[in-house]
Structures are given as C-alpha cells and as structure tokens.
Amino acid sequence: MNKSRVRKTVVPAFCFCLLTAVAADETGAALFIEAGETSGLDFVHFNGMSGELYLPEIMGAGVAVFDFDRDGDLDIYLLQGHMIGPGKTLGEAILPPKKGAVLTDRLYRNDTAPGKSRLRFTDVTKKSGITAGGYGMGVTTGDINNDGWTDLYISNFGHNQLWLNNGDGTFKDITDKAGVDDPRWSVSAAFVDIDLDGWLDLYVGNYVAYDMGNPKPCRSATTARDYCGPQAFAPLTDRLFLNRGDGSFEDISEKSGITGVFGGALGVVAADFDGDHWPDIYVANDGMANQLWINQKDGTFEDTAPLAGVSVNRYGMPEASMGVAAADFDGDGDEDLFMTHLVRETNTLYVNDGTGWFDDKTAETGLGVASLPYSSFGTAWLDIDNDGWLDLLSVNGAVTLFESHEPTDRVFPLDRRNQLFANDHGKAFIEISDLAGDAFKLSAVSRGAAIGDIDNDGDIDILISNNSGPARLLVNQVGTRNAWLGISILDAAGKSHITGSKVALIRVTGQPLWRRVHTDGSYGSASDPRILFGLGGNRGPQTVEVSWPGGERERWSGLASNRYHALRRGSGIRVGE
C-alpha cells in the first residue's frame, strides 16, 4: 500500500480530533497556558554576554522540577549565569540583568493551596542555603543517601556542585567530601544505579575544553564573526562516579571503560536498552558519534552504538546532538531514543527492536522535515491528552548569528519557536504546535525542558528555560478530559523513588503500557519521577506490574483511576515465582 496515501487519510482525521478538543474548551484556552508570571515564578536568565561571542553564553541552561520538601507537589530549580570573560563587569553586559537581581541559581517552593487551581511559587533560595554561583548549565536530581530527600547535582561551566538535602528545607554543599567535583565544562548528568546495589551512582557528561583566557575567533559563511562550533575545541572525557553508600563516591571513569571513547557530551540518559534488566547509558555528543554504553554487569561498559545503529544517522553521518529522551513511544515494551540536533540536520528517532538494536525511523514517522529549520535542545516524551500515547516536545533556539532568517540589528537574534508533536498510535507524528496555545507561538532562545504534574491534577505540565529570558511554565488544559493513573514507585521504607524501575499498565485488550522511573534526559534538565498513565475513557480500577532493577516483578490490582498511588517494594504480589 502506498504510504503517502495512508498519511493523507490518517493525519487529517487525527488533527480534526485535536481541533475539536481545543474548540470545546469553554475558557478559550488551547492545550497549554503560560502560568509563570502569575504564579510568582519571576526568574530571568542572564547569560553575561559582552560582545565577545563566548561559546558558553549561548549554551545554558537547564531546569528541574522535583519535590524537595516532600509535601507532595513539585518545586522548581533554575540555573543562572553571570558575567563571563576575564575582567568583565556588569557594566559591559549587552543584555544587563534586572536591577537588584541576584545572579545565582534559584529554588522556588510550590506553595499552591490544596484544591486551588492558581499556582503559587515562593523563592526560598536564601532559606535553603544553596549558594550556587557558578555559570550554570545543568541540574540532576536523585536521592544519593536513601533518606527519602531529593538531592541536587549542579553541572557548570567550571566546578560542579553536589547539594545534599538536609530534610528541613535546607541543603549542604558536600561536593568535596563526596569527591564528585569536575572543574571542566559539564552540561548533562544522570543518577543511575549501575551495579544494582541500591545506591545511585553518577554519570557526568562533559563538553569541550574552552579556554576563556584565549578564546578562538570564528566566522560564519558570510565571513562575519560568529559563535564557534564544538569542532573548534577538543572534546572532554565523561566521568562515572560509584556511590560507596557512605556519602562519598569513587571515580571509576577509567576502569569502567567510558574514557576510551568520547566526544563533546550534551545529553545523557540511562535506561535498560537491551532488555537484560541492567541500566545502560546513552550519551548524545555535539558533532561527533554518540555512545551507547551497555552495562557488562561487572562495573564496566561497552560502547555498542556503532553496531546498534545509534552512533550516527541513517546516512552514516554524526550529528550535532543536543538533547535526548528515552521512552517506549510505540507501545512494544522497549526504550526508543529521540535526539535533538542542529539547524539543517533533522532531529532523529531511533526505534528499538527490543534487544538493543535500533533503526533510524525519523523520515517514516514525519519527524524529519519539521525539524530542519531549527536548532533544538531540550526534549521530552509526554502524553499531552492522556490517551495512552506519548507525544513529543522539542524546544528550540539558534546557536549562531548566521542562523537569523532575516537581517536584523538585534544583538541576540537566536530566538525560535518551540514545537509539539502528537503521536498517531506509534506510527507517525503530527506537529500540533499551532494548537498548543500562545506559548508555542512565542519565540525564545529555549534550552532546558522538564516535565511533571506541577498542579497535581493528573496531566503533564512543562517547564522551559530560556537563555537570556524568563522561564516559561506551561500548564496543561486538556489532559484531565481523559482518565489517568499516577504512580510513585518507592523503596520498602516508602521513602525514595527507585530509579530504573519499569511499570506496566496491564490492559484487558492490547499490549501493556510501559513507563520508566527516571528524572534524566532532555538537555541539562530533570523531570518528575512519578509515573503518569493516560487511560483514555477507561475510568475503572487498574492493574500495574512493576519490574524492579534486576528483574524481580510485583503486581498491584484494584488501583482507583484519577488519583496518585504510592507503591512500596515488597507490598505487591510477587510475579513469576
């Protein structure tokens, strides 16, 4: 059957359904509304640019949504920049910060009143004790000491920091004690239990060796001076730290094998890609081949990316990989990969066959042409309307002045609009950005993206960071029209989310829906670890099966829909014994 004819019949029908849903909203709102300004989220990113075209100034920054105070709702962490360059002062800033702005990372506590729809955030950075004044790039969340309180790892252009959550609203800098500093340029990282001992280890992706004291001048195709690309600098090796369980980490980078192959990392995601119940690590590199580190179960990893089909695109070319997201978008039970790339390169979708071998299905699924005009960074799989199918977010912003579509006198013309794609039953994606609301019509220099149920109403919201611009909080307006099921997958004590667990929603007809417990992926960002299943019109009791790291399984039945459930390890019915 002719594929083009199939597309012509499927796409309009799908789009018609979405248009009907949007039009039916009595408030006139589209898929998302912007709630940052009205909620007290007053953060504006400052990149410190002074006209020297330093590469770091266009690369930040990520964001995080996480429940730091364990009150049941998601708080927000935003990374900040500062003046950059030897001897540079605020008086030289081309885009100066707001008068009185404190140029450090910011922590916002979610103070939304129970049962209220209006979100409220309070800046509690000073109270928290967090003094993260580095040039922020990325943030990673996880409970490193299994006390039930989420900790923070901050990746910087410069020294990184590990902030331990004290459980009383404050944090302590334990970077030196823990032994996880890296003075180079880090962007994305991931907490992952590589040896299945119950303690989260840490993978840190490092970018390039950039010397602020002797920056290289670069020029565009028009010979005008422009931002350099990564090829002008030497790539850096990544780091892997093994959690000893006593608050310290061992650097096992060399003996694990990950320093043997490397290439300017910007994105990191951990998942079981080959189906052996052990976590693997995928690294997205900028302009160089990517790595798929398969866990050998003895503390070492093997890069299988070239053989697995995920080191380069279908034409054998490495791409400028920025962000990465892993999830089961097609409902076959394995982890697929989506990569964001540079303008005039397509973003790339790698489809897993279940054994860790992948096919580039970018063109077949409709994700290629739509991405060509954009340089894309943060990305996430999210079920916008709770129909059970994972849709796709891509946030965009240029990286060179040459990318400007028209001549302009603006000093920072890198802004682009963001994109949203609807999943057509795992077969194709249709861009629905125009239906998503005014927030997707705005242009910005977007970098980080994190997702989570910010208002706890049962659908996925979006937080986007913008370089030299305000953070954008996009609240979902359509997801709760369908039924949903929220799950927290916890240890036996009911304290910590067990990263790497897989959860299957068992359905009477059709294959199970699989989701992974994680916070990593995107670009320098961290998302909600809770699982949210879209149930469509099925509002009855639900059954889920949890596959714990290592392969043990438990099942829970009779879970009421349209609410969150906390499932403790050991409290379900054992499966497969």
Question: What positions do the PLM features span?
Answer:
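Bacterial N-terminal signal peptides
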Residues: V11-A21
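Beta-propeller blade repeat segments, especially FG-GAP/WD-type strand-to-loop junctions
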Residues: A24-E34, I84-V124, H159-I174, K216-R219, ...
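Gly/Ser/Thr/Pro-enriched helix-cap/hinge segments flanking short amphipathic alpha-helices
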Residues: A24-L31, M49, L53, L367-L372, ...
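Repeat-based blade/solenoid architectures
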Residues: L41-G62, A101-L103, S128-T140, G179-A190, ...
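Beta-propeller blade termini
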Residues: G60-R70, R109-N110, Y135-T150, L162-L164, ...
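Hydrophobic beta-strand segments that make up the repeating blades of beta-propeller
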Residues: I76-Q80, D147-N156, L202-N206, D276, ...
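Asp-box/WD-like beta-propeller blade repeats and closely related beta-sheet repeat scaffolds
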Residues: V124-T141, W149, S155-I194, V204-Q231, ...
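Beta-propeller domains
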Residues: R244-D246, K255-G426, S433-G437, L442-R447
